[in-house]
Amino acid sequence: MTLKHINATEAKKLVDAGALLIDVREAHEHAGENIPGARNEPLSRIAGADLGAASAVVFHCKSGARTRMNAQALSGCTDADVYILDGGIDAWKAAGFPVKRG
């Protein structure tokens, strides 16, 4: 298992190749704005989440702070390679990648 911090371009490549994208923000944050295809699994309940058999999982939050602070706990949720999107959805938007607004 890998635990690696990546930028938005690397995250986009992984997601395009089939990685599971998990938004760890609370449901109201995800509803207001999200990355298309991202699954919402808030940190408050991530421990019980079924992440399936994905070979790679990319976690993100708004700015990267929550995922960075919880990286070890997040990596314990799956046997897959774990990636943390540095800068979160803010970095994704700054890279020009699409977001969906509620």
PLM ranges: what are they?
Residues 1-20, 24-58, 65-102:
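Rhodanese-like catalytic fold shared by cysteine-dependent sulfurtransferases
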